[in-house]
Amino acid sequence: MSLMRAAVYRGSPRLAVEEIPLPEPEPGGMVVRVDVCGVCGTDVKKIDKGLAPPPRVFGHEISGVVSALGAGVKRFKAGDRVVVHHHIPCLQCFYCELRLYAQCALYKQNGTSAGFEPAGGGFAEYLKAAPHIVERGAIPIPAGVKSEVACLVEPVNTCLKAVDAATIRGGETVVVVGQGPIGSMLMQLAQVRGARVLVSDLSPFRLDLARRLGGLTFDASKGGLEEWVRVETSGRGADAVLLAATGQGPFDAAVGSTRPGGRIVPFSATSRGETYQVDLGLLSAAEKQIVSVYSASVDVQEEAADLVFSGRVRLQELVTDSFPLSQVNEAIDLFRRPAASTMKVAIDLRLG
């Protein structure tokens, strides 16, 4: 039996780097050697809060190289560089017909695995992709695109879905609260849609990066975001506010910064039990809309990949910290408590 290294979740916040069986492709599926896997907050929440039964191998922001093919696979050959999405819908059910792909039963099944209960598998040297992932959720990486950039196709997809859920039109003013890696992606994608984008954060490093990427910035440590937004919008407020920060304070600032009839997307609120107080009477009287959105969409899959591969969304500057698999716990610790200059944390399997 061939073995590989993997960071296995066994119920503790500390992952165990172990040797486990190398996966084999099923008919129509394939095995991918992982190059880089981004550390995502949804996985860290599952680890920290014990939201998923062990054992599992997490990691779903994946770029790698096709290693082995199952019978009947024609789209790829061994050696092809690919991005693999871990969730892909059936495109035939009630929810798919409504374009609510994240509610599809097949979508909810994780389609990539390094072993155990499927959970992404990117924190391992190899993973297997199910046939529907190979058919509709694997994307070739063009020559010249770095693996640490390519692995961000999946989060860019989720952010583009959020931006489009806010129905942003050219010439509108959009506020993004928070300028971590997700906030930066939201800012850049709103710019792609033609918006003038105002952003806020507490970190001087992140605000400086946002300015270099074309955002108009506000230091949230000073307070007064709502007043600043009104000054920047001739007293009206933002057409849409995208939340890339958690907590009652940022949520209140988002609601207060939105014009009457505007849209609020609480993109960062992905944990069940994450509750905020809101004055529904005030919200209704001003006809402000809270727009819920979750996960990725096949509708923007091709465009999201093109935005990443073409460099129209600048991502190289976001990947600030890369760790070998042997230091996966150090990587997750840095994600939990980022340094002043930390943006995106990644596991680079090529480092050992």
PLM-predicted stretches and their roles:
Residues 1-6, 252-256, 298-352:
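C-terminal hydrophobic helical "lid"/dimerization subdomain
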Residues 23-37, 50-97, 142-144:
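Glycine-rich beta-strand-centered segment in the early N-terminal region that forms part
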Residues 92-177:
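NAD(P)H dinucleotide-binding glycine-rich loop of Rossmann-like/cofactor-binding domains
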Residues 143-223, 227:
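Mid-domain Rossmann-like dinucleotide-binding core that forms the NAD(H)/NADP(H) cofactor-binding site
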Residues 229-238:
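A short acidic, Gly/Pro-enriched loop at the edge of an enzyme's catalytic core
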Residues 248-310, 346-352:
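Glycine-rich phosphate-binding loop and adjacent beta-alpha segment
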